[in-house]
Amino acid sequence: MRSMIRMTLAAAALGLAVPALAQNAPMVGGAPMMANKTIVENASKANNLTTLVAAVKEAGLVDTLSSKGPFTVFAPTNAAFEKLPAGTVDKLMKPDMKADLKKVLTYHVVAGKLDAKELMAKAKMGGESANLKTVEGATLTVKMDGDKLALIDGKGGGAFVTQPDVDQSNGVVHVIDSVLMPKM
C-alpha cells in the first residue's frame, strides 16, 4: 500500500514538473523549445517556422538536422520567407530545384554550436565582423549592429538575429528576420 502511495505521489510530482519545465523553455512561434529535442523536432512545433520546416523536408535535410551535430542554425521565420521576391519559395520547392533549395538551407547552417556570446566575440576579435564557414561551403559574415547580431550573405543581403540562443539537443538555433542567399 505504501509503495502504491509513493508511486502515486511520484507520478503527481512528475505531472507538475513537466509543465514547469516547459514554462522555462524559450518560446518560438508559440511553442516551447525543449533543449532535449532536436532542431527538427522543435522547429516542427513552431507556427512561425512552418515554411522552413517544409523546405527542410523538401530538400531531404530532416535526417541531417536530426542527427547528433552539433549545428548552429540561423532559422528564417515565415515572415522572412515572405520578404523574398514573389514566386521564389514556390520555385525553390519544386522537385527539380532541390539542389538549389538545399544550397540555400545549408547556407543557414554552421558546424558546431555557436551561441550569441561566441558570435559576438568572433565579431569583436575580427575588428567588427567575422566570417563563418557554412555547411553549404560558402562564408557568411557576422557583425554587431548596435546591440544586435547581424548576418550578411554572399549577395550583400542581411538579416538580424531576433531570437538568439534557442538550445537544442544537437546544437543551437538563432531565429532571423530574413532569408540569407548564397551566390548561385
Question: Which residue stretches match the model-derived regions?
Answer:
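Mature, structured domains of secreted/extracytosolic soluble proteins
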Residues: 6, 21-184
